[in-house]
């Protein structure tokens, strides 16, 4: 299988980079130290443009998994200080706004916030949440190839990602062993869990 993708926003504005020796928060310095060269124009292996191949492959993978009954739902949980509480999720709104927020009001607030930052020539971060439904048990291998370990490695390889939480993540540190677990039960003849503490994926 082969594919080709063209990015309409990949135009390099060289004049915006020529006066910058080392770009803060980017891989410029590390690349220069490791390879003795860095491309100040952007677009190299450390560029966000590299993820276009992942987007294409991910779209195909999502379709294939759908044929197996596995459903992936990914959306922005927060944009800067604008956060959506789980009780206010409306998944029908995800594709109705450019931020993929599952809430109409939050999307409007995020648009206003980002617009203000753009006027100030600034930017912000966010939190992405991914849910997988109907995933079969037994995926992954012991120790280094556990499913959550492989997911964390793949996601952390994206340059802009600075943190990954599986399930309740760091909140588990303030929890107890008796509450931070998922007891098993039988529902309609199938083994199910009564809660979902350790398996929901958050990306920042």
Regions found by a protein language model. Give the residues of each.
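Glycine-rich, N-terminal phosphate-binding loop and its surrounding beta-alpha-beta segment
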Residues: 1-28
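Residues in well-ordered beta-strands of folded domains
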Residues: 1-2, 30-32, 75-77, 131-133, ...
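Intrinsically disordered, low-complexity boundary segments flanking structured domains
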Residues: 15-16, 115-119, 151-153
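Short, functionally important structural connectors and interaction interfaces within domains
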Residues: 21, 32, 44, 153-156, ...
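Residue-level signal for pocket-adjacent positions within structured domains
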Residues: 24, 28, 35, 179, ...
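Glycine-rich, mobile lid/loop segments that gate access to catalytic sites or pores
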Residues: 33-143
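Glycine-rich anion/phosphate-binding loop at the beta-strand->alpha-helix junction
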Residues: 121-204
């Amino acid at each position: 299988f082969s594919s080709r993708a063209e990015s309409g926003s990949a135009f390099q504005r060289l004049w915006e980079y020529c006066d910058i020796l080392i770009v803060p928060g980017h891989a410029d310095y590390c690349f220069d130290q490791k390879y003795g060269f860095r491309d100040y124009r952007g677009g190299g292996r450390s560029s966000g443009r590299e993820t276009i191949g992942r987007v294409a492959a991910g779209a195909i993978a999502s379709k294939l998994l759908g044929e197996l009954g596995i459903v992936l739902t990914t959306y922005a949980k927060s944009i800067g200080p604008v956060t959506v509480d789980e009780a206010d999720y409306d998944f029908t709104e995800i594709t109705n706004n450019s931020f993929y927020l599952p809430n109409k009001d939050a999307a409007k607030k995020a648009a206003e916030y980002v617009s203000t930052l753009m006027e100030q020539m600034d930017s912000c971060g966010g939190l992405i949440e991914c849910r997988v439904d109907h995933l079969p048990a037994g995926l992954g291998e012991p120790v280094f190839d556990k499913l959550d370990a492989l997911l964390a490695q793949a996601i952390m390889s994206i340059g802009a990602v600075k943190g990954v939480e599986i399930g309740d993540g760091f909140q588990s540190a303030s929890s107890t062993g008796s509450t931070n677990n998922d007891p098993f039960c039988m529902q309609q003849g199938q083994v199910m869990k009564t809660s979902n503490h350790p398996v929901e994926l958050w990306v920042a």
